[in-house]
Amino acid sequence: MIFVVKASCFETNPKTKRLLDLADFVVRGRHRIYVEDEHDVNYATWVETLPQELADDWQLALDYSVEADALEPAKLMVSICENVTSDADAIPPSLTVEDAALLGREPFRIFVENNDADRNFLLTFANLQQKRKLEDLERESLLRFEHCGGIGDVVNKLNSHIAQNPLFFKVCAAVYDSDAKSPNA
């Protein structure tokens, strides 16, 4: 996910902690962050007011974002603005800094009927590299398998999750199987 930080985020009382949280997600290899206008006066002033170590961390996140996107382009861009309310239906989606930080820390969730059985089923079909990656992401709390208890409950749990924040549908998937003895049964 690419977070594009608009100039409005630096105009009045920038949410420095949340912006630095977004930068931390980048450094951990989770997302990318760009500043829409690095020449904006308010942005330059904000960077200058940061302690040197935090300014260096911020720049590292920006540099890492360019490098990571060159190697593997992100598929979702989210615009971060402070003068609007969050709008998950906008193209691109538009979030406040607070909502972006909330979304940024959200693990990718895979909703399954039975946590252990379906998780193991997915890992069985993954090649060795994919399996290691999935296990690493799970260990780092970047991926979570959500037990739903049955096919009927998958939809309910997924809808409940998305109701918390409509943009969460971008960071989840549902996996289920058929227990039918034959196709179309």
Predicted regions and their residues:
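Acidic, divalent-metal-binding catalytic cores of TOPRIM
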Residues: 1-185
